Amino acid sequence: MPLPKHLPALGGMRFISALLVFTSHISTQPFFKNTEINSALQFPLNRLGPLTVSFFFMLSGFVLTWAGLPDKSKVNFWRRRTVRAYSLHLPVLLVTLLIVLALNEPNMGRSVWDGLLTNLLLIQAWFPDHHEYGSMNPVAWSLSCELFFYAMFPFLFAFFTKVRTDRLWRWAAAVSVAAVSIPLVALLLPASPPLPWDPDMPQLRWWFIYMFPPVRLLEFVLGMLMAQIVIRGRWRGPRPLACVALFSAVFAVTFAVPNHYDPGALTVPVIALLLASVAVGDVRGVRSWLGTRTMVLLGELTFAFYLVHYLIIQYGHRFAGGKQGYYRQWDTPAAVGLTLLAFTLALGLSAFLHFFVEKPVMRTLGRPRRSPDAGSTPRSEPAPSGTP
């Protein structure tokens, strides 16, 4: 069976994950004056939102492997991926800097200039200091990881394409075990100081588990392996609904695991199964609501949506009457309305950035160049997955 160039259902999944990130960040700035509603939102979303990071990193590895390296040029690949990442990161960073300077309020920084250089170079995730990775536009830390993944991808791709087909599942299992074990390794790190926003979590351990690019590379590699399994016709896993049920069961178990372990690590293998099972549906021509034109379009907007949504929530709340360190709260109807307004603004701005900034930049600077050993056409040219 010939493999399709595009996997539309994965685009739909990308947007659903971005929506979870949005609602998770909404819950951290409680709009609702009703404390019961705030608690009901925060209880699952504070746990579910970060899990989308695993999905996005796996998705990135999956779609890049699906596209492959058609011209076999590492330099061309690195250039295209860097241009695509910076096409939106730079303008959003500039707007963020202007807002921070206008308000004279650093975002987790000690001064308004904290983190500017590391954010500009997208190396903030390499520093175990929340004044760096939490400064400016805090969600951009994941792009710091993505650039590291891009740097490693040509070498990893060359290696895994040579792995024997009958050993792919063993590799996937080994990487899954490694990812689940990372919180145990983190216990070797100092237990103090704690995170400013979570006194029960040591700052260095949290950075190592959640931010450190080589650690998050495991999820990217797992996505690559699942793509190889699907490409080579070795998928024998459960269907999407069964994967969703399995994820729900494991997710419920995570609430019984201490926070300092990072319970979300337990869901990594299940997310990998869900990702591959949805992709297999596309390969087999199974129609899904995730693959409709609307969902695919929303998926294309996800990178821009991810980069702007937190700024709209954070500073929208600030301009609506909140102050630094204080989140104004509203009655339920007003809070619902403001949440919908924030989502609408984020989606509208992401559409503008995608069509009038990202795409023109890619047409001008990100166009593939022919190399002497150019090969076949890629199955697709994936966008940055976007992460919380």
Curated annotation (Swiss-Prot):
Q: Which InterPro entries match?
A: Acyl_transf_3_dom, Acyltransferase_3
Could you state one GO biological process linked to this protein? Answer: antibiotic biosynthetic process
Q: Which domain of life is it from?
A: Bacteria
- EC number(s) stated in the UniProt entry for this protein: 2.-.-.-
Cellular component per GO, a single term: membrane
Q: What class of enzyme is it?
A: transferase
Pfam families in the record, alphabetically? Answer: Acyl_transf_3
Gene Ontology molecular function, alphabetical: acyltransferase activity, transferring groups other than amino-acyl groups
Q: Which PANTHER family does the entry mention?
A: ACETYLTRANSFERASE (PTHR23028), ACYL_TRANSF_3 DOMAIN-CONTAINING PROTEIN (PTHR23028:SF53)
What biological function has been recorded for the protein in this entry? Catalyzes the acylation of the mycaminose sugar during carbomycin biosynthesis. Recombinant strains containing care can use spiramycin as a substrate and convert it to the hybrid antibiotic, isovaleryl spiramycin.
Name of this chain's protein:
4''-mycarosyl isovaleryl-CoA transferase
Q: Which organism is it from?
A: Streptomyces thermotolerans
